[in-house]
Amino acid sequence: MLTKSQKTKQRVLEAALSLLQNGEPGKVRMADIAKQAEITRQALYLHYPNRADLLIATTRYLDEVNGIDDLLRPSREAKTGIERLDHFIDVWGNYMPKVYGIVRALIRVYDTDQAAAAAWDDRKAAVRHGCAAITRALKQDGLLEPKQQDATDILTTLLSLQNWEQLTQECGWSQSKYLQYIKHISKLSLMSRSAD
């Protein structure tokens, strides 16, 4: 059972998420979120002292609502680096359509809105963390070709929202085609030829 404080935080996060999904992140103010959550601005600031903290919490809440930890469990529990890579690409590739609207909005104001930039940077760091775990697993399996840092950079770039957007939204690829080719390209880029 949630405490009163937890219920208020949840209401705030739901309000922030709704406003971000239905508006422009750069124009969503703390006062707007407080009003939507039916609390005072002062009460909002007790929970989130600044807009950046609130936007970061909101994007993490979006992950929680979508059950990202449960979705990633097969990747995290995979026995091999290749299994981990395949599971992670499946999860992230299929997750992007769910968060596309809000992430695209954050990216659009990235250069002019520090709070939105902080929220997007936080999510990119989470993806990079997953990519680093994959490259570590591939290295432990003796399959990693480039240096681990370079491999993490490559995989993070391959799995970027911008690449997904280009292929699925601009080029019209289906999700299954995107997943198939990103897995193939990732393996070609990361794994030694002897692993083929």
List the model feature ranges, each with a label.
Residues 1-7:
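N-terminal intrinsically disordered/low-complexity leader segments
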Residues 11, 19-53, 57:
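Helix-turn-helix
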Residues 93-107, 114-141, 149-153, 186-191:
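Amphipathic alpha-helical packing segments from all-alpha helical-bundle domains
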Residues 48, 108-112, 158:
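Short helix-capping/turn signature of helix-turn-helix
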Residues 59, 66, 70-76, 96-117, ...:
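Amphipathic alpha-helical segments used for helix-helix packing
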Residues 138-185, 193-196:
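Hydrophobic/aromatic-rich alpha-helical bundle segments in the mid-to-C-terminal region
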Residues 53, 57, 70-98, 152:
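Hydrophobic alpha-helical connector segments
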